């Protein structure tokens, strides 16, 4: 997955990087993941760049709603799933009905970017653009063959995400 490569590349550049692994990926539980993320709060500060993919995007937004933290440097949200998808899927419905609080999100980060593709099976183009508009974030649309921006859609090593992560 591109996240593994990004983690290794950032470590090689001697960046201070954390790549939390959340339990039970096959059957994720929002409350459990929130607890696990909260244990890392001492590492979240004004120099933090959060890069979240898919369910991680929803986790981060819920974390902000629950723990309103220090303003961070940059937030990069990649391929968020739609609420309709989350609700319709038994393994992800604990993540559904999330709140998109534009003021809270805007106040939580100096800079932000939503990255999505036009053919992500977990979120329609209309939903992604609405997501970006509600959060008042910049929006980068990847080519139509990018899918969910994961290994299944050809995203092993993804050099552009390293450039984006370092662009502060």
Locate the predicted segments by residue.
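Gly/Ala-rich beta-loop-alpha elbow adjacent to hydrolase catalytic centers
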Residues: 51-61
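Catalytic histidine-centered segment of alpha/beta-hydrolase-like enzymes
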Residues: 28-29, 145-158
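Catalytic histidine neighborhood in serine/cysteine hydrolases
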Residues: 15-18, 133-150
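Short beta-strand/loop motif that positions the catalytic acidic residue
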Residues: 108, 113-116, 120
